[in-house]
Amino acid sequence: MAVPPSIDETKLEAFLGQMVGDLGAAANAPLMLLGDRLGLYRALAEAGPLTSRALAERAGAAERFVREWLAAQAAAGYITYDAAADTYAMPPEQALVLADEDSPVFLGGLFESLYAM
């Protein structure tokens, strides 16, 4: 299909950027649900920087799964990764939204609502 000459390239690029962002968010949604259900966000927020093995032990989850989950969450900017120490951490701002159920900005329950849809 040929692109009509009346296409606004700036609008097209903006829409493509929006679509890529939406697809990334959709791909991360199941991981957010798992992080909430398994207590991974909470454990990471409470303990401070942890290796994947240490977080897996705290959460009672398989280390391989936790390692993959951590890598995806770091890539999405939900947590941070310190390559020198090979540890992951949750910044306090993210902890308020993802781990602190008493926070007025906690969105953990939203993951369950999205899953139910």
Report residues per predicted region.
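N-terminal accessory segments
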Residues: 1-117
